Amino acid sequence: MRNSWVASRKGKTNVSQMHFARKGEITEEMRYVAKRENLPESLVMEEVARGRMVIPANINHMNLEPMAIGIASTCKVNANIGASPNASDISEELKKLDLAVKYGADTLMDLSTGGVNLDEVRTEIINASPIPIGTVPVYQALESVHGSISRLNEDDFLHIIEKHCQQGVDYQTIHAGLLIEHLPKVKGRITGIVSRGGGILAQWMLYHYKQNPLFTRFDDICEIFKRYDCTFSLGDSLRPGCLHDASDEAQLAELKTLGELTRRAWKHDVQVMVEGPGHVPMDQIEFNVRKQMEECSEAPFYVLGPLVTDISPGYDHISSAIGAAMAGWYGTAMLCYVTPKEHLGLPNPEDVREGLIAYKIAAHAADVARHRSGARDRDDELSKARKEFDWNKQFELSLDPERAKQYHDETLPEEIFKKAEFCSMCGPNHCPMNTKITDEDLDKLNDQIQSKGAAELTPVKLNKEN
């Protein structure tokens, strides 16, 4: 789809959506996004130029269907997949990709750390994906030196970052905000550093006693990104890994640096979103969202969860969806899903489905609460179908039609019950919605209340057979 769109851009020094927007040019990607989001094209251009919206769209990701992440667009959901040294293979990851797209993921991150050829699995995923693909390049940087921190140098990081851009990665998590002076602030935490990328860089800085190379070479990374229109997802290496550590000095010190880096990237006309926590008590979620907006000049916020309790292993998709819905309501632009396997193991395809549906619910709830135009239309349509006992339409309008039908059919599988005015919860005699109270009945009742008062009412026969 995008071949003709990007043909004239290749070879230029800056092909980012922000660069074109700041020149007053509306790209084909902006037009596509405007149509998908039901927004004026001019507004999309203005939001991208300002940095409040990103359109992750690497010029080498040809089958991409462009989408937007930002406060002016609907709340988005990211799904994570990826092979590890202990589990999975390419076919399994492609199966997860298909499920993620089927159940509505807006973006997808390949977090593979080993067990497969990392370049091969990434290329396969990008070629098969219509949604933006993100990566964490420090994983492969470490893998390229066989896990040896001592052998890992600054150029290794930049080499892998550019390789990912060349392959068509749309956004990369760059852990440039973690500074060597932040590391002592971790003392006193219960869980310390829980970011894999942050952990790698912390070890590198402690071994070499040098500043974070992703920070010192940040302008070089910007030069790479703008040639491919790769978007920064600035990683939060010091995100809290438990409620105790939330909103602490370490987290907020890094956030301040992330804000500075956001503005540095914008000077290069490179798109930026900023990652956030993590594990956060419910009463601190609004503070975290507002603080990010303040420090990062309203760059789109992209949060992992946050989980609102630490005691839900096996159910962390539920705990985190609660926090995600709140974060979305307060203005977070994209929610990174959590699966039931979080903290326990590598998710399988069914875990991907469970996590994604939980987060589609959270994102949709946030859109409804923020009164986005048309956000509640589907809810109202399903409610009308429910009132009319149109079971097939209810299934069709559900976020997970297969699950809705499965649960209905467990007790009433015969086709005749698809027209029944009850389900197995209430049965035919106790469902309040099949009580035939009509508008005419209510009008008659209201007339009597207005003329006589409630104490003097005479019986009104309902339009219902007894």
From Swiss-Prot:
GO terms for cellular component: cytosol. It comes from the Bacteria. [4Fe-4S] cluster binds at C423, C426, C431. It catalyses: 5-amino-1-(5-phospho-beta-D-ribosyl)imidazole + S-adenosyl-L-methionine = 4-amino-2-methyl-5-(phosphooxymethyl)pyrimidine + CO + 5'-deoxyadenosine + formate + L-methionine + 3 H(+). Its cofactor is [4Fe-4S] cluster. It is an enzyme of class 4 (lyase). Keywords: 4Fe-4S, Iron, Iron-sulfur, Lyase, Metal-binding, S-adenosyl-L-methionine, Thiamine biosynthesis, Zinc. Pathway: Cofactor biosynthesis; thiamine diphosphate biosynthesis. Zn(2+) binds at H279, H343. Binds 1 [4Fe-4S] cluster per subunit. The cluster is coordinated with 3 cysteines and an exchangeable S-adenosyl-L-methionine. GO terms for biological process: thiamine biosynthetic process; thiamine diphosphate biosynthetic process. Disulfide bonds: none annotated. Its EC number is 4.1.99.17. GO terms for molecular function: 4 iron, 4 sulfur cluster binding; carbon-carbon lyase activity; zinc ion binding. Substrate binds at N80, M109, Y139, H175, S195, R196, G197, D236, S237, L238, R239, E275, Y302. Pfam families: ThiC_Rad_SAM. Belongs to the ThiC family. Catalyzes the synthesis of the hydroxymethylpyrimidine phosphate (HMP-P) moiety of thiamine from aminoimidazole ribotide (AIR) in a radical S-adenosyl-L-methionine (SAM)-dependent reaction. This is Phosphomethylpyrimidine synthase.
